[in-house]
Regions:
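Sec-dependent N-terminal signal peptides
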Residues: 1-4
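N-terminal Sec signal peptide cleavage junction
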Residues: 12-13
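Residue-level marker for the onset of beta-strands and adjacent loop->beta junctions
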Residues: 16-18, 146
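Buried hydrophobic packing residues in well-ordered domains
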Residues: 18-20, 26, 127
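Post-signal peptide N-terminal segment of mature Sec-exported envelope proteins
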Residues: 22-36
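Post-signal-peptide N-terminal segment of Sec-exported extracytoplasmic proteins
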Residues: 37-62
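Mature, soluble, non-transmembrane domains
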Residues: 57-164
Length: 164
């Protein structure tokens, strides 16, 4: 689902923050920021490609904050089926498999993020999900009764799960 831009991960500081919100009617909105500290004045950091089949639901812009440069994608109105296609924002996205599904009244998030190729120990990689109801189980950190966050560690594979 969310993407990690792996090209700049091997050098310099990296920031990838992705967040999603799931509505009661199974519509997903959120934001992805992929940025790095520029190597020189011409370095724009990670860049997203907004040529998606549902491009009208995604807005891509430049990101420049706190000494980091890159891209920001804001999306809304995505279905559970469209969500994994966000990885197509970058040809460098790799090792990410996150999905949402509904089972009766439960919304279930399952995912796997492989950061074994990330050598930047200082990388700040987070993923958070806000659900339409109370989270009943998760292997992430509960930020609120309906919000879970994962701090993804460089060099390892992380699995994520949550039910609401």
């Amino acid at each position: 689902m969310f993407l990690l831009v792996l090209a700049p991960l091997t050098s310099g500081c990296l920031r990838v923050n992705a967040s999603i919100t799931v509505s009661p009617d199974d519509v997903v909105s959120g934001e992805i920021i992929a940025a790095s500290k520029p190597r020189d004045d011409k370095d724009l950091g990670p860049q997203f490609d907004e040529n998606l089949p549902f491009g009208q639901k995604v807005s891509v812009s430049s990101y420049d904050a706190d000494g980091y440069v890159g891209s920001q994608a804001v999306f809304s109105g995505l279905s559970f089926a469209e969500l994994p296609q966000l990885a197509n924002l970058s040809e460098d996205a790799s090792g990410v498999d996150i999905s949402l599904r509904r089972a009766g009244n439960l919304v279930i998030l399952e995912g796997r993020v492989d950061l074994t190729n990330v050598t930047d120990a200082e990388a700040d990689v987070t993923f958070s999900a806000a659900f339409p109801g109370e989270v009943t189980s998760t292997n992430g950190d509960r930020v609120d009764t309906d919000v879970v966050q994962w701090q993804l560690k460089p060099g390892v594979v992380t699995t994520m799960s949550a039910q609401s």
